[in-house]
């Protein structure tokens, strides 16, 4: 493939919108399901082969790993927006400069975040008042996950680049390979070698590293037009770095700001005891799995909007928004019905049936959150559309609203209503985010359509 080739087969500016969105979202969904299988394998193996105490230890780290890992993920995936806009507009020189400056940005994120988080992990757990009987295991798990952040950055930067091209199939294939490795390595290190929670953490980061390396090799071989052809394209460019930071940092902050609310929530869940922590942990794993299709649709929509924004096809952006929301709402109704009738069976994936209290907490959480999926479909559709147009900074406002919602429920309701309030948290949080991001999308879309056409 020559450097000037436009890769028309990955363009989203022409053709049937629903088919494009679903064909792109399909591999992304599979990749996200595989990513969740990572987490489910860890939790299921730890819960079934170690103990509910070990599961609680892993669960006690979830909000911390969420805020740190998702800051890195959001920051790295953010490169897909300026890259997709340059690609959609046919500006390959700009595309190469965004790519190389994105590499510099990702390296800085990896080094800084690893050094800070790994050295402060014990202090973080102390601030969260992690129960003493699970503190040691939680600390071991957290340190290993944080030391593996460079591998998380590698995979998600490559994922962001592939999303810019509308190429979601290969990254999914690589994730499938690493997921199989993760499950077998999990079983080997936890069950055979007896490394405990440390084995689960090592399996996770090693396997993600495999996906990252495979993705990087694939990009190097297929997308030759990304790589600089002269010294000017290889050097640091303040203009391109500024645009990358303007897009990537808000996305990273939006993910992490939302997670700050989750940390406050985790603080109050920890106060409810070991059984509540284990139930919340297993319920949250299932929730993340159920929400994968909505995330995949949002990711597809972001790339779709980015390319069509670059091509000034606002008619397709509007139609893409409507089609994505319709699909999301249909899916939400289906999952609500499924969760109500199969919640107990889902809980038994993680928890022994003899742990009746933990099973009860898990089932209650699953059934509650399934009611709120329709809200999340609207939230994701609006948020990913705003990000695709290159205005990720406004996602921070939505993230702040969600953070405030989580914090308010945790502080005001959990002390009085206990675990029930933990379950209500999701719905109230989503409503807060919608109240902010939906008006922003409508105003932005109308303004940009008038000014650019």
Language-model features, listed with the residues they occupy:
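Short alpha-helical transmembrane segments in multi-pass integral membrane proteins
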Residues: 1-25, 83-148, 192-249, 305-372, ...
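Transmembrane helical elements of multi-pass membrane transporters/channels
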Residues: 23-42, 144, 155, 178, ...
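Small-residue-rich hydrophobic transmembrane alpha-helices
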Residues: 55-115, 152-171, 279-343, 376-398
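Hydrophobic transmembrane alpha-helices of multi-pass small-molecule transporters
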Residues: 67-70, 114, 182-186, 212-216, ...
């Amino acid at each position: 493939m020559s450097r000037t080739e436009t890769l028309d087969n990955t363009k989203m500016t022409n053709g049937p919108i629903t088919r494009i969105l679903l064909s792109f979202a399909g591999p992304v969904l599979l990749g996200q399901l595989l990513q969740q299988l990572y987490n489910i394998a860890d939790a299921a193996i730890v819960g079934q082969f170690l103990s509910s105490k070990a599961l609680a230890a892993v669960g006690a780290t979830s909000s911390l790993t969420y805020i740190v890992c998702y800051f890195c993920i959001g920051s790295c995936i953010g490169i897909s927006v300026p890259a997709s806009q340059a690609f959609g507009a046919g500006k390959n020189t700009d595309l190469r400069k965004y790519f190389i400056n994105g590499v510099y940005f990702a390296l800085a994120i990896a080094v800084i975040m690893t050094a800070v988080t790994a050295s402060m992990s014990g202090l973080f757990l102390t601030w969260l008042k992690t129960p003493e009987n699970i503190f040691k295991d939680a600390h071991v798990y957290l340190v290993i996950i944080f030391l593996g952040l460079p591998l998380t950055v590698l995979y998600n930067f490559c994922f962001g680049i592939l999303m810019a091209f509308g190429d979601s199939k290969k990254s999914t294939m690589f994730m499938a390979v690493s997921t199989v490795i993760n499950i077998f390595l999990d079983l080997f290190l936890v069950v055979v070698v007896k490394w405990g929670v440390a084995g689960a953490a090592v399996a996770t980061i090693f396997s993600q590293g495999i996906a990252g390396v495979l993705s990087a090799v694939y990009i190097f071989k297929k997308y030759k037009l990304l790589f600089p052809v002269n010294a000017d394209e290889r050097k640091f460019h303040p203009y391109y770095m500024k645009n990358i930071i303007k897009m990537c940092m808000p996305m990273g902050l939006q993910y992490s700001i939302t997670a700050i609310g989750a940390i406050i929530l985790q603080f109050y869940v920890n106060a409810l005891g070991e059984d509540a922590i284990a139930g919340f942990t297993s319920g949250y794993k299932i929730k993340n799995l159920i929400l994968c299709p909505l995330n995949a649709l949002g990711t597809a929509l972001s790339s779709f909007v980015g390319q069509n924004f670059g091509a000034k096809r606002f008619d397709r952006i509007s139609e893409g928004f409507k089609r994505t929301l319709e699909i999301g709402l249909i899916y939400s109704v289906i999952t609500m019905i499924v969760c109500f009738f199969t919640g107990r069976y889902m809980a038994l994936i993680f928890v022994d049936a003899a742990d009746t209290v933990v099973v009860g907490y898990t089932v209650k959480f699953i059934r509650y959150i399934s009611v709120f999926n329709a809200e999340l479909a609207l939230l994701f559709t609006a948020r990913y559309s705003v990000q695709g147009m290159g205005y990720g900074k406004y996602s921070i406002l939505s993230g702040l609203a969600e953070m405030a919602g989580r914090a308010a429920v945790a502080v005001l309701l959990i002390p009085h209503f206990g675990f029930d309030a933990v379950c209500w948290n999701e719905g109230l949080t989503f409503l807060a985010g919608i109240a902010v991001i939906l008006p922003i999308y409508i105003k932005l879309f109308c303004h940009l359509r008038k000014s650019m056409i």
